[in-house]
C-alpha cells in the first residue's frame, strides 16, 4: 500500500505527462511491492517556501506497511529526489521526504484493513 504524496510549488503545466506512472513503477521496483497497490498523489501549484525562498521545492511523504527504515529510506530518498530533480527541476536540497511505517491494522482498503 505504499502511498507517495508530493506537495510542490511547481506549476501544473510543468508536471510532465507520465510522471505519476514513472513514480509508481520506480516505487514498485524499489519497495518490492506490486504497482497495483501503489498510490501517487502530486499536488502542484502550492503556495510554498523553503528556506524563505519560493524557488521550486517539494514537501513529500512516503507511507508504507513495512519496507521503511534506515538504509531503505536513504535509497528511497536518492531515487525520489533524483526523479523530482530530473522531472520537476527541483534541487534535491529543496526537497523534504517524511517516511512513515504504517501499522497494517491502521490502513483501510477495499472495505477492510490490511491486517
UniProtKB/Swiss-Prot annotation:
Keywords: Acetylation, Cytokine, Cytoplasm, Immunity, Inflammatory response, Innate immunity, Isomerase, Secreted. It is found in: Secreted; Cytoplasm. Substrate binds at residues 33, 65, 98. One of its GO terms (biological process) is protein homotrimerization. The modification N6-succinyllysine is found at residue 78. The keyword Secreted applies. InterPro entries: Macrophage_inhib_fac, Macrophage_inhib_fac_CS, Tautomerase/MIF_sf. The active site is at residue 2. It is an enzyme of class 5 (isomerase). GO terms for molecular function: chemoattractant activity; cytokine activity; cytokine receptor binding; dopachrome isomerase activity; identical protein binding; phenylpyruvate tautomerase activity; protease binding. It comes from the Eukaryota. It catalyses: 3-phenylpyruvate = enol-phenylpyruvate; L-dopachrome = 5,6-dihydroxyindole-2-carboxylate. GO terms for cellular component: cell surface; cytosol; extracellular space; nucleoplasm; plasma membrane. The modification N6-acetyllysine is found at residue 78. Its main location: secreted. Its EC number is 5.3.2.1, 5.3.3.12. Belongs to the MIF family. Pro-inflammatory cytokine involved in the innate immune response to bacterial pathogens. The expression of MIF at sites of inflammation suggests a role as mediator in regulating the function of macrophages in host defense. Counteracts the anti-inflammatory activity of glucocorticoids. Has phenylpyruvate tautomerase and dopachrome tautomerase activity (in vitro), but the physiological substrate is not known. It is not clear whether the tautomerase activity has any physiological relevance, and whether it is important for cytokine activity. Homotrimer. Interacts with CXCR2 extracellular domain. Interacts with the CD74 extracellular domain, USO1, COPS5 and BNIPL. This is Macrophage migration inhibitory factor. It comes from Ovis aries. The gene is MIF.
Amino acid at each position: 500500500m505504499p502511498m507517495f504524496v508530493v506537495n510542490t510549488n511547481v506549476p501544473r503545466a510543468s508536471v510532465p505527462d507520465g510522471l505519476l506512472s514513472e513514480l509508481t513503477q520506480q516505487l514498485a521496483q524499489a519497495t518490492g511491492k506490486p504497482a497495483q497497490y501503489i498510490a501517487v498523489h502530486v499536488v502542484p501549484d502550492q503556495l510554498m517556501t523553503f528556506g524563505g525562498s519560493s524557488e521550486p521545492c517539494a514537501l513529500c511523504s512516503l507511507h508504507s506497511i513495512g519496507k521503511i527504515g534506515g538504509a531503505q529510506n536513504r535509497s528511497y530518498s536518492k531515487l525520489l529526489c533524483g526523479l523530482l530533480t530530473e522531472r520537476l527541476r527541483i534541487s534535491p536540497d529543496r526537497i523534504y521526504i517524511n517516511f512513515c511505517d504504517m501499522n497494517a491494522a491502521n490502513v483501510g482498503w477495499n472495505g477492510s484493513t490490511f491486517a
